[in-house]
């Protein structure tokens, strides 16, 4: 009766990039997609930082949807620093990087695993979803492309760490 129920916001990136571009073009709108992966990552970190401030986290429960270890670690540390971890969940696709969510669970973090489900009449949507996931997950700058057998100190680790650091240093200058 008094209201005040928190909202749930799922923070993710890279989803439906092509469709956003097509729709904005068809409707004569400016393209909402940032021009580089670094800008997208920086914007994600910027929004995450704002969402996990104590005064925001209580009203806006945030789902950190990512398989990127650097992003997950940043969210974890930020939520600890801000005492806002009780208002945050980590969200991951079932069957993708299961070792990551298991480790998060052992730390006591709240985990939501999800899997796409469609009715028979929407099966074509499932095919397009799978094709999009395969395209995203095999892109050279996508974390999951490099995540198997990832070890600290390797060239791959250093590449991914550099990606994260570049985004981190730009997080306060993106819109």
Region annotations inferred by a language model:
Residues 1-175:
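Positively charged, amphipathic and often flexible ligand-engagement surfaces
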């Amino acid at each position: 009766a008094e209201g005040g129920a928190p909202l749930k916001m799922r923070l993710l990136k890279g989803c439906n990039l092509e469709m956003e571009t097509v729709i904005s073009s068809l409707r004569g709108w400016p393209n909402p997609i940032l021009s580089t992966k670094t800008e997208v990552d920086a914007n994600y970190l910027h929004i995450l930082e704002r969402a996990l401030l104590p005064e925001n986290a209580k009203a806006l429960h945030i789902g950190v949807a990512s398989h990127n270890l650097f992003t997950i670690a940043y969210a974890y540390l930020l939520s600890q620093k801000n005492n806002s971890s009780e208002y945050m969940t980590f969200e991951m696709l079932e069957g993708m990087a299961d070792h990551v969510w298991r480790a998060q669970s052992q730390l006591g973090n709240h985990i939501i695993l999800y899997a796409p489900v469609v009715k028979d009449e929407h099966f074509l949507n499932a095919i397009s979803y799978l094709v999009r996931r395969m395209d995203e997950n095999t892109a050279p700058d996508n974390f999951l492309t490099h995540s198997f057998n990832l070890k600290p100190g390797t060239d791959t680790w250093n590449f991914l760490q550099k990606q994260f650091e570049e985004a981190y240093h730009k997080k306060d200058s993106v819109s």
